[in-house]
Amino acid sequence: MDGKPATRKGPDFCSLRYGLALIMHFSNFTMITQRVSLSIAIIAMVNTTQQQGLSNASTEGPVADAFNNSSISIKEFDTKASVYQWSPETQGIIFSSINYGIILTLIPSGYLAGIFGAKKMLGAGLLISSLLTLFTPLAADFGVILVIMVRTVQGMAQGMAWTGQFTIWAKWAPPLERSKLTTIAGSGSAFGSFIILCVGGLISQALSWPFIFYIFGSTGCVCCLLWFTVIYDDPMHHPCISVREKEHILSSLAQQPSSPGRAVPIKAMVTCLPLWAIFLGFFSHFWLCTIILTYLPTYISTLLHVNIRDSGVLSSLPFIAAASCTILGGQLADFLLSRNLLRLITVRKLFSSLGLLLPSICAVALPFVASSYVITIILLILIPGTSNLCDSGFIINTLDIAPRYASFLMGISRGFGLIAGIISSTATGFLISQVGPVY
């Protein structure tokens, strides 16, 4: 793989495969904004300041007769910005419910995408997630149980859309461009987190919190149109690809080993130590990232005592750093490989180690610098930024060791990660309710 200078032919960034990476970037952008929308909106949905003035609030739905209270004006509180009395434990369950849904579909969707093609499966998952995002404000009016159900099904849809991406890259990404292409696509999640955290609070204040769901749900529907128009399962069947690019991709992929059969070698996978290292990496990575992504707006608003608008803006800063580090890490990884400066295994280990060690050090340091506004913000920026170096490490590693089963293995890997996400978000909500907001 390292000795193929021919894989550098052609105008890389003007090629169709980089166009596909941008479409996947947009789809990942869309899915993460839909996932994080609730983390922003919930600050207004369970606004404790407003709740204190509402004596007849329901535990599962909005305040039905809020307008009967003459001390609350229509401008301050209306049916478009209902307040719900959801405890920290309930919020933790709501946050983690989308992970329950994702984990249900990760493994089967990864396997089926490898057999039947990823285009339809990913597109359907994105469309379902977008429609359920539009439905979320109405679901909240019917009670917390329906919200949990909607988020669970939404997670199932996003699980379909997540894992199949590696099936496409197994057929579209030349080995020496894998880090670049996958990190361009994957950085959409970090950039989406930046956008939703930056503008979500502004939308909530200017238009009321339901519009957070309406705007990003509609964005997902637009993304679906692009997806079904531009994305194809492999370069052989794409009507717009040039002959030169098609030959470049096919010739580079022809030199890597492949398995002709569809049977999954489960026994070999179970006994493969590198795979277990990847699974453990996903578990550790998702544990920290889920806590940061889910509770960062609340942490910022309570620790730094800022309003929802400023909380969203501050919470967004770490994720622009994450998007930048993701892309730069991919460029650096492929540079090291293409110049034969480091072996493939060394590059993956290097980026995996940096992506796990550096954010952990920053997270451990946070409680000790809580009194310093500037240092706290710097550490919160560094945590997601350095964590996304993993995208050029173990996260892409399944494409290296088993490209034929990349989506199936990615489903299992994300399953380990989402188990960590479920445990961490639920445990965090429980600890907050028991210990209280000590910060």
From Swiss-Prot:
* Annotated SUPFAM superfamilies: MFS general substrate transporter (SSF103473)
User: Pfam family example for this protein?
Assistant: MFS_1
Expression sites by tissue: Expressed in the small intestine, kidney, spleen and testis. Not detected in fetal brain, bone marrow, and mammary gland.
- Family membership: Belongs to the major facilitator superfamily. Sodium/anion cotransporter family.
Top-level taxonomic group = Eukaryota
Give the UniProt keywords, A-Z. Cell membrane, Glycoprotein, Ion transport, Membrane, Sodium, Sodium transport, Symport, Transmembrane, Transmembrane helix, Transport
The record's subcellular location field reads: Apical cell membrane
Q: What does this protein do?
A: Acts as a membrane potential-dependent organic anion transporter, the transport requires a low concentration of chloride ions. Mediates chloride-dependent transport of urate. Can actively transport inorganic phosphate into cells via Na(+) cotransport.
Q: Which residues are glycosylated?
A: 47, 56, 68-69
Catalytic activity, as annotated = 3 Na(+)(out) + phosphate(out) = 3 Na(+)(in) + phosphate(in); urate(out) + n chloride(in) = urate(in) + n chloride(out)
What would be one Gene Ontology cellular-component term for the protein?
Answer: membrane
Which membrane topology describes this protein?
Multi-pass membrane protein
Transmembrane stretches, start-end = 98-118, 130-150, 183-203, 211-231, 273-293, 317-337, 350-369, 374-396, 415-435
Subcellular location, principal: membrane
Q: What processes does the entry annotate via GO biological process terms?
A: phosphate-containing compound metabolic process; sodium ion transport
Q: What is this protein called?
A: Sodium-dependent phosphate transport protein 3
Specify the signal sequence span: none
Q: Which organism is it from?
A: Homo sapiens
| InterPro entries associated with the record | MFS, MFS_dom, MFS_Na/Anion_cotransporter, MFS_trans_sf
Q: Name one GO molecular function term.
A: sodium:phosphate symporter activity
